[in-house]
């Protein structure tokens, strides 16, 4: 299964969106997909399609040959939280990475005491970030995420198509 596109789903309510994303991309890219899931899942999800679901992310990342065996070209994460080992791999910039469906609850509220207006964020480690809605995109802009990385609306549970930004909001006119 090497090379492949790795899709990680943190929350059970985003699993169907992950499958829809894989179906859409498989038609366009003609590649294989590997799906992992987060600690929030109480049991292994069952795919309605022919995708390889390898298991919980913590089990896979603890396996020393995981990245050698699968060698993903792209890592797509749907929602959070993300395990440290995954974010450290993404931070190394070895893989093209996308964070889709960022929700407000994923954003850190911690402020550094030295720089009170700066919020440390993992989202700068990703190549692209798609947010759940305009409010979340605005929060990312305010929390020091590189402007060119925020690309628009993310996936909805029921739809694969990204939603456009509001034309009335001048904050997003430069995207």
Regions found by a protein language model. Give the residues of each.
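Active-site and donor-binding regions of nucleotide-sugar-utilizing enzymes
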Residues: 3-165
